[in-house]
Amino acid sequence: MKQKTYDVIVVGGGAAGLMAAIHAASGGAHTAILDHHEVSGKKILATGNGKCNFTNLMQGESYYRCDTPAFVLHILEQFSAEDTIAFFRELGVMTRDRQGYCYPRSGQASAIRNALLRKAEKLGIEIHNGIGIRKIIRENNRFSFDTKSGSFFSTCCILATGGMASPKSGSDGSGYIYAKSFGHTVKKPLPALTALMAEANWLKETTGVRADATVKLYVDGSCVAEVPVKYRWLIMGFPGFRLFR
């Protein structure tokens, strides 16, 4: 059975987990990733319909919905969209800008995933795949990880497990359980995005078609909001992601 100790252990090997591990290792920390998937970064391949919209030039507090949206300004100052583009450029990924949406010039999400994995390997980050974590214990400023593959220990633990919207890709809600066990307060997660159902015969003819459109919100007969979107029509209605965002 394995028994290893690190400065930093990142739980989750998706985009956030890989980026967190890369930055920790770049600062000199002995870093590892524990990923219950057999292949890290798998979810990245499905991002942006397989093209990976990895950042957006249109950023600011108005794009966030919370009690204190201004909190994001400090975060963006630390690592902006421009910093993200420069980061991937150094890894050999050129960017294509489509109205503020940034994609790898190759048009393939695998370019982003492969670049992150190569960088992680270059930095000596140890990625443990197929790890089933039973429990994470924080005691005396040290984290211990009880897994099906052995025990791991670290001074710092970064949770990058995703939410609970896509269990098949790894976002199964386990991160909330770990966070609570560390004493963090977790608000009850609620679904935020869902398709908007509609009954219209023309939807059958346009299913799968992508087009520019305008979404308008009416309250008491008056238009109170209007935003341009790119849509891919569905037979049962409209994709919720564009509408509710």
Say what each PLM segment does.
Residues 9, 25-49:
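Glycine-rich FAD pyrophosphate-binding loop
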